[in-house]
Regions:
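A detector of single, family-specific signature residues
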Residues: 1-171
Length: 172
């Protein structure tokens, strides 16, 4: 009779890690949903633009975050000179935006078409957006740490199973 050691505690650890990862992923989704409501209040037109008219490929990206948190209001974007906005976008995107002039034009157009808020509402919304960006980044870092722990645990249970799982499209 050939028997293998009982690995119930390892499976329990894996179960807890995967459930915690799901919890963190749900937290990111919830935070992004909450952030979208604040984004609509601060920069209404940016949220409702179709994909071709969007100045940013990812509304939750670094350049978008910089625009949303470093410009006090949409009026500041409208009032910014073309050169100033181009330099800002180039610096914050680390020159990764291929067509800065087009992005700047789309951003200014969206800012011009957005609703104007009372100045007293602009600062709390900017703070809330900055906080949401920080929370999302923090959750992403935690998910990376959990992924590493899951990988380590799965390799401890069965190293071959991990490689098999990674080879399946949609899972790995």
């Amino acid at each position: 009779i050939k028997s293998s050691p009982w690995r119930g505690s390892q499976f329990l650890a894996l179960k807890r890690l995967t459930r915690h990862r799901l919890h963190l992923a749900e937290c990111i989704t919830r935070e992004k949903t909450y952030m979208i409501s604040n984004l609509f209040l601060k920069f209404s037109e940016l949220e409702i633009l179709d994909q071709e008219s969007q100045p940013f490929s990812n509304i939750f990206g670094t350049t978008s975050a910089a625009v949303l948190t470093e410009f006090f209001s949409v009026q500041d974007i409208v009032d910014a000179s073309e050169e100033e906005l181009l330099q800002f976008l180039a610096k914050k995107s680390r020159n990764r935006i291929t067509n800065l002039a087009e992005t700047s034009k789309l951003l200014k157009k969206a800012a011009q078409d957005s609703y104007r808020l009372d100045k007293r509402a602009a600062e709390p919304l900017t703070i809330a957006l900055a906080s949401s960006f920080n929370c999302i980044e923090s959750y992403k870092k935690e998910i990376k740490a959990i992924d590493h722990a899951i990988e380590k645990t799965v390799k401890g249970v069965n190293p071959n199973a991990y490689m098999i799982l990674r080879s399946i499209p949609g899972i790995g």
